Amino acid sequence: YGSCNPCVPSVDLSLQGIIDFTVPAGGSNGKAIHLVALQDIADLSIYGIGVANNGGGTDGQEYTFDAISVLAGDQILLARSPSDMALYFDSCYSQFDHVLTATSAISQNGDDAIELFLNGSVVETFGDINVDGTGECWEYMDSWAYKSAGDSTCLGGNWIFGGVNCTDGTTTTYNSSCPYPLCPLPSGCTDSLASNYDPSALVDDGSCLYSVTFNVDMNCE
C-alpha cells in the first residue's frame, strides 16, 4: 500500500516433467509436459507454454492453458494424445489430477527447451532456448526429463533424465528401462520359482509363496 511499484504475481505453477515417449502409435502422440500446482490457482489460463525448437531462441507463448481451477499439489499433464498417454502410463495415469489436450504447439523433439509463461512473461525455463539440446546433458529424445535433485552437473542439479531412446520399442512406462519417476512401481512376488510369481511386478514385496513337497515313507516294517 502506498508503493508505486506494481504488484508482482506469485508463480504458483511449475514445470515437473518434459516428455517425449515413443508410444506404440508413434508420431507426436508421446509428447507431453507435466506440471504441478504449487498453490491453488483460480484460473489456469494466466499460464502458457512455449517450445524453443532447435536452439533458435524463444518462440513466445504458443499454448494457453484452459480456464480451469486447480488445487495446490495437483499434477497436470498437457498431452498431445491423452488416450495414448493413458495406455502408455498404464496404472500410473491415475496419478494425474488433470489431463489436458495439447495443441500441435507442444512439439518438443527431445532436444528443445521449454518455457513457462505467466501473463505473457517467462517465469521458468527448461534447457537453453539458444542451444540445440542434441548431445547436451539435458537431451531427452524418446525419453523424459523430471525435476528432482540428483544430477549435480546438469541444469543446476535440479533435473534427472531417463536416458536417450529409453522408451523405444516399449508399450508402457513399466516395461521400459526408465519408468517415469512419478509412477509407483508395481509390487508383488518377483521370484519366478514361487507359486504366486507376478511377472508384472518390479518390486518384491515379500509375498512369495513356495510349494513344499513331503516324502512320506509308508513302509511299516
What are these regions (language model features)?
Residues 38, 65-69, 105, 137:
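Short, surface-exposed secondary-structure edge patches
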Residues 37-43, 52-57, 81-85, 118-122, ...:
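Acidic glycine-/aspartate-rich tracts in secreted/extracellular proteins
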Residues 61-87:
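Intrinsically disordered, low-complexity Pro/Gly/Ser/Thr-rich segments with frequent PxxP/GP/PP motifs
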Residues 46, 98-176:
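Conserved beta-structured recognition patch
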Residues 14, 32-36, 48-50, 75-79, ...:
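Residues within well-ordered beta-strands of beta-sheet-rich folds
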Residues 1-14, 165-221:
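Primarily marks secretory-pathway-exposed extracellular/lumenal segments that are disulfide-
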Residues 7-55, 106-109, 217-221:
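A structural motif detector for short, solvent-exposed N-terminal "entry" segments of globular domains
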